[in-house]
């Protein structure tokens, strides 16, 4: 029996890990093809369109019916989780990246086939007036602590939950990839609740293109059969089905969750013990170890992790499958950008992905140009707004007087951008004569254009004082910064 269980566990891990370690599928073909009718002629800034209230928080939905979301193949929500709020366990048909805008707490992911190696012991009193206590031991899979600036990877069909263990609301933005090959259903985000319900959300989104949660999955089973399968009575089965439960899908934990928070030494010891058990029981094959202990959370707000840094302009932190291997399973990447007052970002385009830009703080002026050289967006993005930037569209950004911080979620696990100006840019790579003839300028002008900003990459220092907020021409300045 032990051998059968071990074999089943290994098979499950192998199936789920196949995309994680396989190099046979080209990264450029990691998503289902977009409709040829998609057009990005006029981009717009988005804010949440609808809100669904639960007992301990809100779920805010962006306009998933808009063509830009459907063409980019993304579905975006924002959750506000109140202190002691628990986002009940669930899974989705599509993978997602969750970015922690603010707050702290815990998140759990339950990978199939992985053992429950984390143990904690509780002591409960039956009644307050009683001195009798009962001890019991709980075993579960790893729990991750999250904090502001974290990216949490949520693989498709893997159950997960969030809990706000802090004193202030936690704000989380989720971006789902509905065109992922992990989704074998229709190209829509579908959430399968393991507990609670979302009746109010079902009513609000009755005519929505996306299928939002109603009752949890246990509601679809016969009570007697469910009781027999789980070894519980019918009353308990009805509770699993959340009948007459009006709390929604973000519930309040009255006395807080009692969770184990191991120190680094304890984590290392648990890791060592897990390896010993796997070898001793003959189960170790490399897959279980890598998959069951894979890192699902990483912080990209920490300045020390910046990939590009300009002390006078800002910093950029990139997140790809080399830094965060679970992204191979997700098929998405990210970047966090912090621009100082009036700083610019070198003109660029995304080579292999669409980009979902969410403004965390401050404001930024953005211009986007399409393949015909036409402006498809020219405006200022403010805190809480979102902009979808299509693949290959040229972009230029300039922070306002209050600076800007934003996160960009990319629709591929190894996103790449092509800078127009600065170090390692297109202009730096072109011969002077090519530049001179292409733009009908002298060789000296071409040389200056090529070498301008040669010591900068990504964030650019502002060089032109602003006399008034209304007075400057943004595009003219953008071209001036690269010497044109």
UniProtKB/Swiss-Prot annotation:
Primary location class: other
Record-linked Pfam families: Cupin_1
Any GO CC annotation of this UniProt entry: protein storage vacuole
Recorded GO MF terms: nutrient reservoir activity
Keyword tags: Disulfide bond, Seed storage protein, Signal, Storage protein, Vacuole
Paired cysteines (S-S): 38-71, 114-292
Keyword flag ATP-binding: no
Signal peptide extent: 1-27
Keyword Disulfide bond: yes
InterPro entries (alphabetical): 11S_seedstore_CS, 11S_seedstore_pln, Cupin_1, RmlC-like_jellyroll, RmlC_Cupin_sf, Seed_Storage-Functional
Cupin type-1 domain sequence ranges: 43-238, 298-447
Subcellular location: Protein storage vacuole
GO biological process: seed development
Assigned protein family: Belongs to the 11S seed storage protein (globulins) family.
Summary of the function given for this chain in its UniProt record: Seed storage protein.
Subunit structure: Hexamer; each subunit is composed of an acidic and a basic chain derived from a single precursor and linked by a disulfide bond.
PANTHER family assigned: 12S SEED STORAGE PROTEIN CRB, OS03G0336100 PROTEIN-RELATED
Identification of the protein by name: Glutelin type-D 1
Naturally occurring in which organism (per UniProt): Oryza sativa subsp. japonica (Rice)
């Amino acid at each position: 029996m032990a051998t059968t269980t071990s074999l089943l566990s290994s098979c499950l891990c192998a199936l789920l890990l196949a995309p994680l370690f396989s190099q046979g599928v080209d990264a450029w073909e990691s998503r289902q093809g977009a409709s040829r009718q998609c057009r990005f002629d006029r981009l717009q800034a988005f804010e949440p369109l609808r809100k669904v209230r639960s007992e301990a928080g809100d779920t805010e939905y962006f306009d998933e019916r808009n063509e830009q979301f459907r063409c980019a193949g993304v579905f975006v929500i924002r959750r506000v989780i109140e202190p002691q709020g628990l986002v009940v366990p669930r899974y989705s048909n599509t993978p997602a990246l969750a970015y922690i805008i603010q707050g702290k707490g815990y998140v759990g992911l339950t990978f199939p086939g992985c053992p429950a190696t984390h143990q904690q012991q509780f002591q409960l009193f039956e009644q307050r007036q009683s001195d009798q206590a009962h001890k019991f031991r709980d075993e579960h899979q790893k729990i991750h602590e999250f904090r502001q600036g974290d990216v949490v990877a949520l693989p498709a069909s893997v159950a997960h939950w969030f809990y706000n263990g802090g004193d202030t609301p936690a704000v989380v933005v989720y971006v789902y990839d509905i065109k992922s090959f992990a989704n074998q259903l229709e190209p829509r985000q579908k959430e399968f609740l393991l507990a609670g319900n979302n009746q109010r959300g079902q009513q609000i989104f009755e005519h929505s293109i996306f299928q939002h949660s109603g009752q949890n999955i246990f509601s679809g089973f016969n009570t007697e059969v469910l009781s027999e399968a789980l070894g519980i009575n019918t009353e308990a089965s009805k509770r699993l089905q959340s009948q007459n439960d009006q709390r929604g899908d973000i519930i309040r934990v009255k006395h807080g969750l009692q969770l184990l928070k191991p120190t680094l030494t304890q984590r290392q010891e648990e890791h060592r013990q897990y390896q010993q058990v796997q070898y001793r029981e003959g189960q170790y094959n490399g897959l279980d170890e890598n998959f069951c202990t894979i890192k699902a959370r990483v912080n990209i707000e920490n300045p020390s992790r910046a990939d590009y840094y300009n002390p006078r302009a800002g910093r950029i932190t990139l997140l790809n499958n080399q830094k965060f291997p679970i992204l191979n399973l997700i098929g998405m990447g990210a970047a966090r950008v912090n621009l100082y007052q009036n700083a610019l970002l070198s003109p660029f385009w995304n080579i292999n992905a669409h980009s979902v830009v969410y403004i965390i703080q401050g404001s930024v002026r953005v211009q986007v140009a399409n393949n015909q050289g036409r402006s498809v967006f020219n405006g200022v993005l403010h805190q809480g707004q979102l902009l979808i930037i299509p693949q290959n569209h040229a972009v230029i950004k300039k922070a306002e007087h209050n600076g800007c911080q934003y996160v960009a979620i990319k629709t591929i696990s190894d996103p790449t951008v092509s800078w127009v100006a600065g170090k390692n840019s297109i202009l730096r790579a072109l011969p002077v004569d090519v530049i001179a003839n292409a733009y009908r300028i002298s060789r000296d002008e071409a040389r200056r254009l090529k070498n301008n900003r040669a010591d900068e990459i990504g964030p650019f220092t502002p060089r032109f004082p602003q006399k008034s907020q209304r007075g400057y021409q943004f595009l003219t300045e953008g071209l001036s910064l690269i010497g044109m």
